[in-house]
Amino acid sequence: MAQKEKIVEINGLIDHTNLKQNATAEDIKKLCAEAKQYKFATVAINSCWVSLAHAELEGSGVGITSCVGFPLGAASTAAKVAEAKQSVADGTTEIDMVINGGHLVAGDDDYVISDIKAVVEAAGSVPVKVILECCLLDDEQIVRACKDCMAAGAAFVKTSTGFSTGGATVHDVALMKQTVGDTCKVKAAVVAVGRDGAFRGLFVA
């Protein structure tokens, strides 16, 4: 495989991301232009920009990942559902929702499952990835979070938001994959600053 083809193949696994709170419309347009140029899988953006991204990316083959309950996951279920429904109406092709970490750590798995399931149902045919924020969890909590996601019908489990104390680690990704098997896919959130550290995490799952 030629080097250029390898780059395109790798780029097709990456969500090109701008989730900054001060991102402007021009920033999102630039993100979309880069995603089209380099053939990234999706642009990952805050939900207020989905309609703009949809217009910018129409016909390009690049998807849109709208982030719901981002970055804390502490919004009410009703708020997450409303955000998911609006994102779908605006043209998102994927949803990244953040798990309710407080209820998870407290052992309230019924709440966690209900919260995720409500968003999955609101999203309809749009796949939902659930961000666990692994840097705040121990191994037992990561395993339990993965099981809750499977029970709720999530399509993916994802390591982190990029807004907390750490990102993906090989250990966390391997533990998640071991737990979900083929029931869910696993996604590592990494900053692609170097081929070794960044992409090791990406390809474990």
Model-derived features: positions:
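Alpha/beta enzyme core
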Residues: 3-38, 42, 48-188, 195-205
